[in-house]
Amino acid sequence: IGIGECSYLPKLNPEKLDTYESKVAEVCERINEHEFWLDKGLMGFPSIYFGLEIALLDLEKKGSKLLFDSDFSLSEQPIPINGLIWMGSFENMMQQVDEKIEAGFRCIKLKIGAIDFEKELHILKSIRKKSSEIELRVDANGAFPPAEALEKLKRLSEYNLHSIEQPIKQGFPATMNQLCKESPLPIALDEELIGKFTKQSKAETLENINPPYIILKPSLIGGIKGSKQWIELAEERHIKWWITSALESNIGLNVISQFVATTKNTMFQGLGTGKLYTNNIDSPLQVIGDEISYNKQLNWDLSGL
């Protein structure tokens, strides 16, 4: 048996929720047409594509959940990950920061744009007082009004940040391109990649914006195949990238982790979301400190599926 996962995030996934279950049912009923589904049949349904793609990979590997050969899959090489700070009150966010630093994280990512901007700057200043070595990333999720974005980027850059994800909403390539040119803080595209299903549209996005970084979420961009295409196009243009899970369970997280391990990308990846679950599937995946590893001494427990 091969097991996949379709991870749907409302307001992010391009699929429509009211037709989602019926599309999954259609794919299951016509599963023998998987070559069609993996060619053009699921264009516009990236998370369902990802679910089918990994189920077939797992079937090919006899249900072992070992889908890609790498030192990670052999339990020999962990993957460095960032610690994620969720948006909240100043006190709550600082508590999360202290916990991540104490746990040994060398890279911290903060969601910003929800509380007062001055308070968010104060949080960054407080982190920098605690450590000048920690790699700091911020994610605005498109929260900055275009007219204010450059000034905010300039102020953020005072805290020696690694990058900012999606400072303005997606869909304004000319404005984003100008920001990438003028910002003292490197910009990473995230939501901007969603909905680009053809190789041409992906290439045009990178050409028109020319960002320093892109962030890949397989469930939102067409699985492993879609991610590989983005990586190829980005590397041709000397654009760096990293991968982030989209709140998948350990089924999806396992595949994403194993895949990124084959790419030899040494950046901090966004693969620490499994701990957010209260009912996750027990698996060999382990997060110790700021690394995720595959511990072959542990077993998969699929009894709850």
What do the predicted segments below correspond to?
Residues I1-L136, N141-A143, S157, S283-L305:
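N-terminal capping/lid subdomain adjacent to the active-site entrance of alpha/beta enzymes
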Residues G88-K100, A147-E151, G195-E207:
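Short, acidic/polar
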Residues F90-N92, A114-R128, F144-E148, I168-K181, ...:
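Active-site-adjacent beta->alpha loops and helix N-cap segments on the catalytic face
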Residues E102-R106, K130-E133, K154-H162, Q178-I187, ...:
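Glycine-enriched alpha-helix->loop->beta-strand junction motifs that scaffold or abut catalytic
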